[in-house]
């Protein structure tokens, strides 16, 4: 069965639900989250999406991302998906939210009200193979350079966050996660 996503208005008020496939085909605004996990050295955990994903397969992105279920808080969903996707838990704190709309491969449209969470973890992730093909701890400045040189290797939402917020904000998030 196709996952149901929460449709929202411009202020993130729930206004209904729709199947994930239809949401991405029609570019409907829906609630989502993006998690940025840092280690004590200030490096960001990136995941390479599984090659079996129906969009953005094999692309590098932030540590974890997903959608809450109806009646589930965004924080609870973020904690659940971090465990399911990457095999660990971390204390998460919300640092921002934003709305974006972008075309993704496969004639699909991402249109998300995206809640951004940060956390600290110093272990080795145990990524679920159906979610994450690989992972890497990456220096923020090197990541900034890589996203500029090779944007085609990254998801549209991750590039949007990197472009809009930049390395200074990422470094601030790393310090916040460590505090």
UniProtKB/Swiss-Prot annotation:
InterPro entries under this entry?
Idi_bact (IPR056375), IsopentenylPP_isomerase_typ1 (IPR011876), NUDIX_hydrolase-like_dom_sf (IPR015797), NUDIX_hydrolase_dom (IPR000086)
**Localized where?**
Cytoplasm
| Active site per the UniProt annotation | 65, 112
- EC number(s) per entry: 5.3.3.2
Q: Which cofactor does it need?
A: Mg(2+); Mn(2+)
Q: Which UniProt keywords apply?
A: Cytoplasm, Isomerase, Isoprene biosynthesis, Magnesium, Manganese, Metal-binding
Reaction(s) catalysed by this chain, per the record, are: isopentenyl diphosphate = dimethylallyl diphosphate
- Choose one Gene Ontology CC annotation of this protein and give it: cytoplasm
| Top-level taxonomic group | Bacteria
Domain (Nudix hydrolase): residue spans on this chain: 28-160
Gene3D superfamilies of this UniProt entry?
Nucleoside Triphosphate Pyrophosphohydrolase
Protein's GO biological process:
dimethylallyl diphosphate biosynthetic process; isopentenyl diphosphate biosynthetic process
Binding of Mg(2+) occurs at: 85
Predominant place of localization: cytoplasm
For this UniProt entry, the molecular function terms from Gene Ontology, in alphabetical order, are: isopentenyl-diphosphate delta-isomerase activity; metal ion binding
Its function, per the record, reads:
Catalyzes the 1,3-allylic rearrangement of the homoallylic substrate isopentenyl (IPP) to its highly electrophilic allylic isomer, dimethylallyl diphosphate (DMAPP).
Q: Which family does it belong to?
A: Belongs to the IPP isomerase type 1 family.
| Quaternary structure (record) | Homodimer.
Name this polypeptide is given: Isopentenyl-diphosphate Delta-isomerase
Gene behind this protein: idi
């Amino acid at each position: 069965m196709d996952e149901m996503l929460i449709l929202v208005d411009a202020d993130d008020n729930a206004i209904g639900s729709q199947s994930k496939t239809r949401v991405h085909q029609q570019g409907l605004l829906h609630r989502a989250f993006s998690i940025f996990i840092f280690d004590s050295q200030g490096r960001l955990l990136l995941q390479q999406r599984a090659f079996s994903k129906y969009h953005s397969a094999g692309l590098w992105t932030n540590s974890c991302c997903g959608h809450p279920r109806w009646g589930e808080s965004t924080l609870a969903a973020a904690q659940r998906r971090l465990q399911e996707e990457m095999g660990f838990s971390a204390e998460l704190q919300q640092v921002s939210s934003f709305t974006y709309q972008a075309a993704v491969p496969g004639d699909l449209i991402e249109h998300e009200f995206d809640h951004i969470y940060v956390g600290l973890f110093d272990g080795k992730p145990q990524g679920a193979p159906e979610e994450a093909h690989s992972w890497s701890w990456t220096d923020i400045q090197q990541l900034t350079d890589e996203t500029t040189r090779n944007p085609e290797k990254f998801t549209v939402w991750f590039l949007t966050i990197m472009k809009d917020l930049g390395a200074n904000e990422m470094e601030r998030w790393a310090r916040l996660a460590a505090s």
